[in-house]
Amino acid sequence: MKIARVFPRRTKATPDDPLAFTGPPPKGGLPDIEEVHVSVAFTYDMEKACQLTEQWMKLGVPVHMGGPAFNMPGGDFVPGMYLKKGYVITSRGCPNRCWFCSVPRREGGRLRELPITEGNIVLDDNLLACSRQHIKAVFEMLGRQKERPIFTG
């Protein structure tokens, strides 16, 4: 399925493939798409995301809004879908319940280990809370990368 992904703003992590957009539908035409996902990372981008959703709905294809700003549990990680290639998420959640952190509430207070995909920029909520086996596998994957690892959390 061809899915256009729309982001309210461009960041270093925004995908840069032909189906990733940071504004209204382009006037010069659009590849055949079957669905549009408006991905919202920050709550302060909600108003712009709603405007973009209305603009993209005019194409007549299903448009869905989602992302971290909605405070819903994260799903499986698909490389390149909502984050530029090179960024990886190998686990979601955290078993700690720090008063200042929304991760345990968002992810249900548990840690989920995900399949490990190739990349060098690790965005896990709490990688060190994972099993030793998972951490070792992540470090082995990082050892295969041409770029040095970056842990941004």
Role assignments for model-derived ranges:
Residues 13, 45-47, 71-75, 97-99, ...:
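Short catalytic/ligand-binding loop motif for oxyanion handling, primarily in non-cytosolic enzymes
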Residues 1-9, 78-108, 118-128:
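N-terminal pre-triad scaffold of radical SAM enzymes
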Residues 41-43, 68, 91-93:
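Beta-hairpin (beta-strand-turn-beta-strand) motif
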Residues 1-62, 71:
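A short, structured N-terminal alpha-helical element that caps or precedes a catalytic domain
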Residues 1, 31-35, 60, 83-85, ...:
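A general structural motif
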Residues 5, 37-41, 102-153:
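Core AdoMet radical
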Residues 65-85:
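Short, charged low-complexity linear segments at domain edges
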Residues 49-70, 137-153:
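P-loop/Walker A phosphate-binding loop and immediately adjacent motor/lid segment at beta-alpha junctions
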